[in-house]
Structures are given as structure tokens and as C-alpha cells.
Amino acid sequence: AGIGALRTVRSFNRCKLNGSDVTGLTRDPISTAQLVGSDLYIMTVDDNGPLFYRMKIDKSDKTELANFEINPASAVNGTIYYNGTQDNHYLYAMNTATDGVSTVWDGNLWYPIAQGDYIYYMDVENDYRLCRYSLSRNEIEVLTNERIDCFNVGYGYVYYQVNGEEACLKCMRDDGSDSWVIAEGNYTAIHMTSQYVYFQMFGETSTWYHSPLGSQSYSGFDGAREAALNAFKK
């Protein structure tokens, strides 16, 4: 590289809520990570293949749990819910107290998210439509027959990206009612807080957008970029 070239170092870090006291935890190429208590559950994929492991937030007690893909994104009350990626797409539950795994439901699902009594998921058998499964009643509800690429659920709403010629980011109530379009085009990285939903245009990682929860408007969000620049200046 010539003079002035920028070298990017990949690192998964821990910091305080105000952005201070940054500590590097690992340089593994992480696809998904989840914090449960004081343990991090990490999914990494590199040239050696996938690896799912657990370690403490102080980097100690690293324990390999699986050499295949497990997405730990959905964790509730010490249980990680995930879909199978080997012989089937069943719904599984990992008890983080013991790291034991049990089969919850022999469905055909992708990207499960637990909310109360329900597991929201993409229905693999039916062109990735959005459904929810009741854990207590063993019942399926179809929320939309549209093919979706990704989604997130929380605070009474579901935000989801519709695939196809009329691609758009949409919102509905978490029972499947009152759907509306937020933005036309292809969006991803949908994150939710109690006040806003945040998302990015597919293929464009430098810009974030946000929308007040339950609204029909959205705008650019520069807070993340400004925080990063301020941290760089220190």
C-alpha cells in the first residue's frame, strides 16, 4: 500500500454505553453474536468453516459448542431459539445454563424470533412468507403471503422487507393487521428500539435510516456516523 493508505483491522469490541473504555474481544469474522447474562454466544465463519462458541465478556472461558451454523440472535430468559441448518429446519432451543439443546417444533422455518408465546419466522416451505407459531397452542398463523427477505419484531410491530418487483420495507402490527409501506426499494439490517426502527439500503453500508415506531415516515440517521467520527478524533 502507498503512503496514506488506510488499513482496516476487524475487531469485535466491548465498551461502555457512552462509547468509552473500548476493549477488543476477538478478531474472528463474526456473523452473529448474542449476550446472555455475562456470556457471549458467537457465530463465526471463516476459511476453516463455521464455528459456534461461548465466552465470557472478559474473554475468558472460551468453549466451542458446534461446528455448524447456529444463529443466536433470538434469546429470551436464558434460552436461545434457532432453526436447524443441517438435516432440517426445525425449531431448536438451547438452555444457556447447561448448553443443552432440545427440539421445540418440527417445522420448516428460517430466522425465528421469540416474542412472548409466539415464534415469528420465515416459512421455508411456502416461499418464505411470514408466520408466527404459538408455543402453548401448537398453532400457526400466517401474517402475510408476501415473500420476504428479512424482518424484525418488537414493541407491538413487525417490520419486514418484501421481495420482488415491488420491493419495499413494510410495517404491520404484530398480529398481522394494518400493514403499510415505509420505504420503496430493498432494505436490510432492521433494528428496533422502543422509539425508532433503524435500517439500511441493501448494498449501502455507509448510510442508516430511521423511522418513528409505528409511523409511515423515515429519514436519514447520522448519529452513528457522528459518534464514530467523534471517537476517532479522541
Language-model region placement:
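Structural motif
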Residues: R7-N13, N48-R54, D87-A93, N126-R132, ...
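Short loop/turn segments that connect beta-strands within beta-propeller blades
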Residues: K16-S20, K56-S60, M94-D99, Y133-N138, ...
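Acidic/polar residues in short coil/turn loops that connect beta-strands
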Residues: N18, V36, D58, N77, ...
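A short beta-strand motif characteristic of beta-propeller blades
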Residues: S20-T26, S60-A66, D99-W105, N138-T144, ...
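Repeated scaffold domains used in trafficking and secretory/extracellular systems
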Residues: R27-G37, N67-N77, D106-G116, N145-Y155, ...
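Blade-level signature of beta-propeller repeat domains, shared across WD40, Kelch, NHL, RCC1
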Residues: N186-K234
